[in-house]
Amino acid sequence: MCGIAGIFNIQSQTPELRNKALRMAQKIRHRGPDWSGIYVGGSAILAHERLSIVDPESGGQPLYSPDHKQVLAVNGEIYNHRDIRARYAGKYAFQTGSDCEVILALYKDKGIRFLEELNGIFAFALYDEETDDYLIARDPIGVIPLYIGRDKDGHIYFGSELKALEGFCDEYEPFLPGHYYRGREGKMHRWYTRDWMDYAAVKDNYTPAAERNAAPASIGRTAYSTQVTAVHDALEAAVQRQLMSDVPYGVLLSGGLDSSVISAIAKKYAAKRIETDNKADAWWPQLHSFAVGLKGAPDLIKAREVARHIGTVHHEINYTVQEGLDAVRDVIYFIETYDITTVRASTPMYLLARVIKSMGIKMVLSGEGADEVFGGYLYFHKAPTPQAFHEETVRKLSKLHLYDCLRANKSLAAWGVEGRVPFLDKEFLDVAMRINPAVKMCPGKEIEKKVVREAFADMLPQSVAWRQKEQFSDGVGYSWIDTLKAVTAAAVSDEQMAHAAERFPIHTPQNKEEYYYRTIFEEHFPSESAARSVPSVPSVACSTAEALAWDASFKNLNDPSGSSGGTRRSIQGLKKELPTDFLPAALLIFYLSNPIGLKHHCLSANHTCHSTRYGNNKFQNHIPRFLHKDYPLSD
């Protein structure tokens, strides 16, 4: 994980512009604390903040072509770089061992028409001194964040985060995933497109002609087994590709299906270095797994069980509700959104990332993307047809860069940790999204993501392989969301809500929790561009707006993460109802005042260790620190 920032279309280089680019880069130095680099020349300035993972010694950026005519700043990882290097052996004089340098070799050979050859997560800016032109591009799904802006003088700006552009240019917006921007044309082009984005291209896949009109449950076992095997093999290959690293790495293990599958596969291959085609022993053969939650949370219990089963060195991070509340203001600054679901889920991940960083881990694999690809959210039980199901998965993938990808990337990057997501691997998507949608469906009480469960059931405890979906922010502890609702409801008055549209005419908050997050967001990012960068659409249980038409009961539900009692009943109808009434104010204050302290537990087959991560933190004056406007960005 790194940070990039810069300016194009410069008519005359000045010290002021260079200083501006440096200040832009400094805003995102948390993403790349290992080294800073800058290029100033021609009509461009490119700045780079590096987190060194591959080739730490010589892979500093910006990168240059052998003749120094092309310069490149990249945030990302190119998983197939070894294959590309082999193709250009003897044709291109590579200057470093960086995986990203293959972008320069491809550009030299093919101009701008090379993006499809990359399998990885990336956002990059390339300047060509010979043509005085530039290219900006982003990966297919938008795993790596990127923004583009402009000013009244015609300069084009780019940056990994909002904070690199806020206050530096007149307007900006998210750079679209799967697109590139070419300077001489001055417009965005889509480079990533797939046949599976159209239902007609996948509706008969893997299915014999005689079964094509059959109900999902009656599709032949042979055809079904073929799809299960395809998913298994493609995901194992994706995880193995993404284990490339010259520094210590780990896995995020929530105890849910998705992270457990990724962790189990990673453990299978962790003992050998993939850079040597698994011939040499890994430099760090012990795989470390990490889980976070309130004490006794469902996720922690299951994560512990999985870790014992697959044999990782497991680290369990306990946080208190108060510590979560104290972190909210920081979290909103780093993740750059006021979306309710994202803030709720990002807070424990942000706290976890700090501990991971303190242990010297620079990269972790995570399970994001499986719910979008396989229809794992509980509302998918209501999908009326295979076509509706498939089209919703495509919509969900197209919006991931605004939600889960943003959360996973920025929560970790806040502490200089890189997150990799094998379920969103480009080659894996081409297999998984071509699976017959009828096979993925989970009508009624049938469990979701059955294909994934059957593909990897033999690698996991059965209680986890067939465990039903939890929202991440529920799994870390049910009282977390309920307390957020209660505290933010007390912080925002009815009168403020009545005038919400006057204060926030763009994406007006629909409830007090959103209003409060929006207030904090505006303190950090006051521009209209910032407000428009965050999506604001009707949702239930993480659905898109289009899926609300699947069931009449969805219209009366207003919790986007699906954690309210009504949502649980309507979406699931499967799990025992959990109490979600708000705590009375006096009890809430008493509960939050308990000085439990964030704890780190290390569990492995050989030892158990416990260490207090933070000291006791009383509830000063019975008011959470995050409610104070002057609460600092860091302790």
Identify the residue ranges that each predicted region occupies.
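Compositionally biased, low-complexity peptide segments typical
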Residues: C602-N616
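Hydrophobic (often cysteine-bearing) scaffold residues that line and stabilize catalytic clefts
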Residues: L17, T96-D99, L118, Q227, ...
